[in-house]
Design a protein with these regions (language model features):
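Multi-pass alpha-helical transmembrane bundles in non-GPCR membrane proteins
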Residues: 11-268
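Short, Lys/Arg-enriched N-terminal segments with co-localized hydrophobic residues
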Residues: 1-9
Length: 268
């Protein structure tokens, strides 16, 4: 009887060891399966994300995916614009001879500086990050600022009077509205509003082009040339192929330089 009891105990201990061993093996197997499934899901998610951005790169407010070299070129190109904006400010401050010219020059510089800074920073951040999506809003908003600030010396110093002031106020009310829409809805959801507004604001100078042609043909040609360069830059921008965004940046730089030369030589 005692021998039977001992044998049963031994069998029980053996069963417990086997159960524990089986439990450990099962636990390892489950953990391994979990990690494998998690890895597969992660890969599937990334593949789905890649397909989404490949087919619909601009369908929502996520930035399009570009190569590292492209983004370096984009950041450096408009980073150089920041330096040029500071140099431009130094030249303008040396030339201005009135309070209104000083104010107009500072507004003009602010628009140039903000646009090139926001653009350079936006293209510096890694794809998929929240900060990149945030700076994309800043980047698109700064286009409005550039247009309005470029007009500041023209409407305040060249046009002047009641018409110049009213024009300046109305234009900036539209600009603030556009920036607010980008802030609330993002840069892509209302493109059918923003792109026409960019165009209308940019070419609103037609209201006083006859005066420019009659009194300052050289100023007219510089401003017109800059506007044409900006518009030509929209071709690679809208195509949105490899390196095309970098080409768009070069057009923006050239357009800004050309119009600055006209404003510096014939207005300030």
């Amino acid at each position: 009887m005692e021998i039977l009891f001992i044998r049963n105990n031994m069998n029980d201990n053996k069963n417990k060891k086997e159960i524990k061993k089986e439990y450990r093996n099962k636990k390892k197997e489950l953990r391994k399966n979990y990690h494998n499934e998690k890895k597969e899901l992660h890969l599937e998610y990334n593949e789905e994300l890649d397909r989404y951005f490949e087919v619909q790169p601009n369908s929502n407010n996520n930035p399009p995916r570009r190569t590292v070299l492209e983004e370096i070129g984009n950041a450096v190109s408009h980073g150089s614009g920041v330096i040029l904006a500071v140099v431009a400010l130094v030249f303008m401050l040396k030339k201005v001879d009135s309070t209104i010219a000083l104010v107009a020059s500072l507004v003009y510089f602010s628009g140039l500086f903000i646009l090139f800074t926001m653009s350079a920073l936006y293209h510096s951040f890694s794809y998929g990050s929240k900060v990149k999506r945030l700076f994309r809003r800043f980047d698109y908003s700064s286009i409005y600022l550039l247009i309005g600030s470029t007009y500041a010396p023209i409407v305040l110093c060249y046009v002047g009077g009641k018409f110049g002031i009213i024009f300046f106020i109305v234009q900036w009310l539209i600009i603030i509205t556009g920036i607010t829409l980008i802030g609330v809805f993002g840069p892509n959801r209302l493109k059918y509003i923003h792109f026409p507004l960019y165009f209308i604001l940019g070419w609103s100078a037609i209201l006083f082009l006859p005066r420019m042609i009659r009194e300052d043909l050289n100023l007219f040609l510089w401003i017109l040339s800059g506007g044409i360069i900006y518009c030509l830059g929209m071709i690679p921008f809208l195509r949105d192929r490899k390196v095309s965004h970098f080409i768009w940046h070069i057009f923006v730089l050239l357009g800004a330089i050309v119009q600055w030369i006209g404003i510096y030589l014939y207005i300030l």
